[in-house]
Regions:
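N-terminal Sec-pathway targeting helices
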Residues: 2-16
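A structural signal for conserved, well-ordered secondary-structure elements
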Residues: 19-158
């Protein structure tokens, strides 16, 4: 085989491998999302999964996290204007909110998780920022889908 033929064969092999890699990545990225997850709205990046959750308190909407879950929350780069998230169960969007930082001077009328207020490895899903008085709309946190899911996996607290 001549050198030019070897280059053509090598180029075809490289292109095939690249194509297979791209198709594989696309396939895996479109797989249904299983379980509970808090995802960044803009990138669909999973921030917290049920593997990061120790317990979910139905009454206070507090989520006790594993040490790894706390690290993930602390690693978020949340701007003063917040970072939108969506809570999903098995890929179905349940409700939206925003990660927020308690040093922000901006108010927010939606659901928030203040990433700077982690206490005892626990985050809280709250109405409005800086207080519930700023919240507008219907409170989506009392979702039977979330409660049922955590009940089934033994992580729901009353």
């Amino acid at each position: 085989m001549r050198l030019s033929e070897k280059k053509v064969v090598l180029s075809v092999i490289v292109l095939l491998l690249a194509g297979i890699s791209i198709v594989g990545w696309l396939f895996l990225s479109q797989q249904p999302q299983e379980g509970f997850g808090i995802y960044l709205s803009e990138s669909n990046e999973l921030v917290i999964s049920d593997k990061d959750v120790v317990s979910y308190n139905k009454n206070s909407h507090e989520i006790k996290l594993t040490a790894r879950g706390v690290e993930k929350i602390k690693a978020l780069k949340v701007p003063m204007t917040g970072s939108p998230f969506v809570i999903k169960i098995n890929g179905k969007e349940i409700y939206n909110g925003s990660f927020w930082v308690s040093v922000s001077s901006l108010s927010h009328s939606g659901i928030v998780i203040d990433t700077l207020k982690i206490q005892d490895n626990t985050i809280k899903i709250e109405k409005g920022y800086p207080s519930p008085e700023f919240f507008k709309g219907t409170d989506p946190r009392n979702s039977y889908e979330i409660f049922d899911y955590f009940q089934k996996i033994g992580k729901l607290i009353h």
